[in-house]
Amino acid sequence: FADLDVNSNKLGATVIKRNEKLVKLLRGIESMKLGDYQDNTIDAFGDAYEYLMGMYASNAGKSGGEYYTPQEVSELLTKLATVGKSEVNKVYDPACGSGSLLLKAAKILGKDNVRQGFFGQEINLTTYNLCRINMFLHDIDYDKFDIACEDTLLSPQHWDDEPFEVIVSNPPYSTKWKGDDDITLINDPRFAPAGVLAPKSKADLAFI
């Protein structure tokens, strides 16, 4: 709830009105039949959550694409990345958004066949929280995913001696980054082999 503004006037003009609205909201959620963790029906609610995000992203137009990858695209990318594999050590998405690509890997391979879990990084706090909620709603145990809220290009959080066996991503296209404004970036082991940094107006090339 870190990015939830409980003092927003959209909830009501006074503190009492806002509290009444929040109580009503929580009671409404409490009364919903969301499925039981033990019988795995909670996964159906996760699918509904992704469907609603997809509808919202569609209505939001270009901005919606910042956090949501359509199911068809997620499935194609993940199948290409997992051809010939029945299990992998771990899956990574450096621009994970709401986590749709990570979850598609869980669905295609089976979550138990991703031995060390699911890893991702997302720069936007709200989208980062959406991703974590999405993981829980799809029955991914807390100790099987590691989502970080940082700028992947400037502050990668998932350095490891053992490389990721599968990397899937739909990075933000045509966004800006520091590029050669920060001369130390050329020493980054991810960029150094190229001998040049991606243009400041083409951060997507830095992801590649």
Kindly label every feature range from the protein language model:
Residues 63-169, 174-176, 181-185:
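Conserved S-adenosyl-L-methionine
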Residues 174-206:
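Mobile active-site "lid"/loop adjacent to the S-adenosyl-L-methionine
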Residues 1-86, 143-155:
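Non-catalytic, mostly N-terminal accessory regions of nucleic-acid modification and defense proteins
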Residues 58-63, 114-118, 191-196:
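Glycine- and acidic
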Residues 19, 161, 201-205:
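Short, solvent-exposed loop/helix junctions and linker helices
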Residues 13-15, 40-43, 55-57, 111-114, ...:
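Generic detector of short, locally flexible boundary/turn motifs and exposed helical patches
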